[in-house]
C-alpha cells in the first residue's frame, strides 16, 4: 500500500469501531472493502485477451431441454428453489415515498403483489413451498415489514433480511461521515447488490434453506416484471451442476451501456463499461461485437454461496460511487452481484428471450406495461400477440410526466400503443380517454400553452405542436 493508504486505514478502522449502529459482520465487511479499494486492486482488463463466449458458456435458451408435463418433476424442481427479490430501492425517482416495490404497476396491483401472486400460484398448483425472500436496505426495511403483513394469509412464506449498512466516507479526510456527527440516514448507504451473498449468509437464512433441502436461489430486481420462475433454466442447472447462471439477452440500442459476458483467461466474466479502457468504449457499445447484456436475473447454488462467503473469496470489482450530499463530498464503495460469476465453478450465462427483461425504471416504462401492449394473467405480465414488432415502442416523456401521480393525472386512460413505434411528449400535454397512437408520434406543447389530446383521437405518424395539428 502507498504510505497515505497505510495511514488512512487504521484511522478509519478506529472510527468504525466506535460506530455502535454497525454489527461486527458489517464492520469487518466494510473495512475489508475499503482496504481492497486502498490497495488499488482494481482489475485491469487486457483487451486482447477478451473472447466471445461459446454456446457452451452462454447457452441459448431454446437449446435447453424442456421440462416434462409431469407435475411430479415440476414439484421436484420447485422444492429446491428459493426466490429472492432485491428490495432495497426507494421509489423517489418516480416521485413516490417508500419502497419502489409498492408502486402500483397494473390493475391496482404493486410489484410485490404480482410477485406474491406468481409464487402463490406455483405453490398451489404443484403443492410445493417456494419461499419468497426480500433483501431490504435500511431505507426500505421498516415500510416493508408493515407491507408484508397483508400477505399473511397467502400460501407463500415471506422472509426478509437487511443488506449491510455502511458509512459514507468523507472524501477529503477519509473518515466515516457518522463519526463526524452525521447521524441521520444520509450518513449511510447500502453497498450495492453484490452484498446479497454475505448478507444472506449472515442473516442465518442461507443455512435454514439448506437444512430444508433448498439448492438454488433465483435473484432478481423487484422492478423487473419479466423475472418469473423458469423451470427450464432451473432443470438445466441442477442437471449440469452449474453453480451460477446469469440471464443475458440480446442488446438493443437502448442497452449499449449494459454489462456483458466475456470469456477471459478461461473463465466466464462480467465486463462492465466502467472497466473498459477509454479507447475501446465505442467497441464495447457496439451491438455487433458484444451482442448480449446482463438482465440481473441470477440463479445461484446455495452451497456454493456458503463455501465462497466462508472462504472470503467473493472479491468482486469495487465500484467507487462519489457523491455530494449537503455540500459534502463523500465516497461510497459498492459491488454488483453479477460480477461474482467468475468465482463460481461451472458458471454459465443463458441467452433468454427479451420477455424476461421488463424493468420499470421510469413512468415511460409504466406507460408500456399499463397499456394494451400487455395483459395480466395470474400475476404474469404477458405481451399482446397482436403486436408484430418484437421490440417495444421507444417512449420519451417530458419532466411533467416524471412523477407517477403527474403521469396518471395527465392520461384519462392509457392510450392504445399496439401499433406504436415511438412516442415523444414534451411540455404541458394532457391525453383524453380512448386515444390511439400508431407509428411515430411527437407531441410538443409550446412553453406557456396547454395542449389537450381529445378523447378517442387517433394519431398516426404525426407531429403535434398545437391544437391546429390535431
Curated annotation (Swiss-Prot):
<feature type="binding site">
    <location>
        <position position="100"/>
    </location>
    <ligand>
        <name>UTP</name>
    </ligand>
</feature>
<comment type="similarity">
    <text>Belongs to the UDPGP type 1 family.</text>
</comment>
<dbReference type="GO" id="GO:0052543">
    <property type="term" value="P:callose deposition in cell wall"/>
</dbReference>
<dbReference type="InterPro" id="IPR029044">
    <property type="entry name" value="Nucleotide-diphossugar_trans"/>
</dbReference>
<dbReference type="Pfam" id="PF01704">
    <property type="entry name" value="UDPGP"/>
</dbReference>
<dbReference type="GO" id="GO:0005886">
    <property type="term" value="C:plasma membrane"/>
</dbReference>
<dbReference type="InterPro" id="IPR002618">
    <property type="entry name" value="UDPGP_fam"/>
</dbReference>
<feature type="binding site">
    <location>
        <position position="163"/>
    </location>
    <ligand>
        <name>UTP</name>
    </ligand>
</feature>
<feature type="binding site">
    <location>
        <position position="193"/>
    </location>
    <ligand>
        <name>substrate</name>
    </ligand>
</feature>
<feature type="binding site">
    <location>
        <position position="223"/>
    </location>
    <ligand>
        <name>UTP</name>
    </ligand>
</feature>
<dbReference type="GO" id="GO:0009536">
    <property type="term" value="C:plastid"/>
</dbReference>
<dbReference type="InterPro" id="IPR016267">
    <property type="entry name" value="UDPGP_trans"/>
</dbReference>
<dbReference type="GO" id="GO:0003983">
    <property type="term" value="F:UTP:glucose-1-phosphate uridylyltransferase activity"/>
</dbReference>
<dbReference type="GO" id="GO:0009555">
    <property type="term" value="P:pollen development"/>
</dbReference>
<feature type="binding site">
    <location>
        <position position="192"/>
    </location>
    <ligand>
        <name>UTP</name>
    </ligand>
</feature>
<feature type="binding site">
    <location>
        <position position="361"/>
    </location>
    <ligand>
        <name>UTP</name>
    </ligand>
</feature>
<keyword id="KW-0963">Cytoplasm</keyword>
<keyword id="KW-0007">Acetylation</keyword>
<keyword id="KW-0808">Transferase</keyword>
<feature type="modified residue" description="N-acetylalanine">
    <location>
        <position position="2"/>
    </location>
</feature>
<feature type="binding site">
    <location>
        <begin position="221"/>
        <end position="223"/>
    </location>
    <ligand>
        <name>substrate</name>
    </ligand>
</feature>
<feature type="binding site">
    <location>
        <begin position="86"/>
        <end position="89"/>
    </location>
    <ligand>
        <name>UTP</name>
    </ligand>
</feature>
<dbReference type="GO" id="GO:0005829">
    <property type="term" value="C:cytosol"/>
</dbReference>
<feature type="binding site">
    <location>
        <begin position="88"/>
        <end position="89"/>
    </location>
    <ligand>
        <name>substrate</name>
    </ligand>
</feature>
<comment type="function">
    <text>Converts glucose 1-phosphate to UDP-glucose, which is the major glycosyl donor for polysaccharides. Acts redundantly with UGP2 and is essential for the synthesis of sucrose, starch and cell wall, and callose deposition. Involved in the regulation of the programmed cell death (PCD) induced by the fungal toxin fumonisin B1 (FB1).</text>
</comment>
<dbReference type="GO" id="GO:0006011">
    <property type="term" value="P:UDP-alpha-D-glucose metabolic process"/>
</dbReference>
<keyword id="KW-0548">Nucleotidyltransferase</keyword>
<protein>
    <recommendedName>
        <fullName>UTP--glucose-1-phosphate uridylyltransferase 1</fullName>
        <ecNumber>2.7.7.9</ecNumber>
    </recommendedName>
</protein>
